[in-house]
């Protein structure tokens, strides 16, 4: 799903809107959902999304590092998620779901900016990592806001299955 969507978006944006710097991506959304449900496995959509984006855009090797390594910075949220799980269990509220989305987006884009700096990018170009992702940011936050209402979507998978088992035992 990720690879097909990214391919369609890249094809459409380069053909129909070649002068526009904006794009939309599923990577932050999938990363966030997988991060909540399965933890470190969120690295897979982060890496695959970065590799695929770079491949489709004909990027040079340093850009592969920027996107693949930069996309992984939100993994730093794993200790926070562990403590949140113990206290709350899920991200079913509006503020927690959107707040987590904002944190993932900022860390992902900040990670790309940081890796770019390490490769010698001009610091004046760094705001572009945040501004070109505006459509992706809005898309991610709106979908997370919707997903929070679906039972178990923004909940640790083990916690969700245990909760279901307990609910079935009570009924």
Where in the sequence are the language-model features?
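Alpha-helical transmembrane segments of multi-pass integral membrane proteins
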Residues: 1-6, 38, 100-109
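Hydrophobic transmembrane alpha-helices
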Residues: 1-37
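Residue-level recognition of pore/gate-forming positions within transmembrane alpha-helices
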Residues: 3, 7, 50-51, 71
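Residue-level signal for alpha-helical transmembrane segments in multi-pass membrane proteins
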Residues: 8-9, 33-34, 53-56, 77, ...
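Membrane-embedded alpha-helical hairpins and interfacial helices in multi-pass inner-membrane proteins
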Residues: 11-21, 60-70, 80-171
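Alpha-helical transmembrane segments and their membrane-interface exit regions
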Residues: 31, 71-80
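Membrane-helix interface "capping/anchor" motifs
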Residues: 33-47, 85-89
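Membrane-helix boundary elements
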Residues: 45-67
């Amino acid at each position: 799903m990720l690879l097909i969507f990214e391919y369609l978006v890249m094809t459409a944006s380069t053909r129909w809107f070649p002068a526009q710097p904006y794009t939309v991506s599923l990577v932050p959304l999938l990363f966030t959902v997988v991060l909540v449900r399965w933890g470190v496995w969120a690295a897979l959509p982060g890496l695959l999304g970065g590799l695929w984006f770079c491949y489709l855009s004909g990027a040079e090797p340093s850009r592969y590092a920027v996107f693949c390594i930069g996309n992984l910075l939100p993994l730093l949220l794993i200790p926070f998620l562990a403590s949140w799980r113990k206290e709350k269990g899920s991200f079913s509220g509006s503020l927690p779901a959107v707040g987590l989305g904002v944190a993932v987006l900022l860390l992902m884009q900040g990670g790309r900016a940081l890796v770019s700096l390490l490769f010698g990018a001009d610091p004046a170009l760094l705001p572009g990592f945040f501004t070109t992702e505006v459509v992706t940011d809005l898309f991610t936050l709106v979908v997370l806001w919707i997903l929070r209402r679906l039972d178990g979507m923004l909940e640790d998978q083990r916690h969700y299955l245990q909760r279901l088992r307990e609910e079935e035992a009570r009924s």
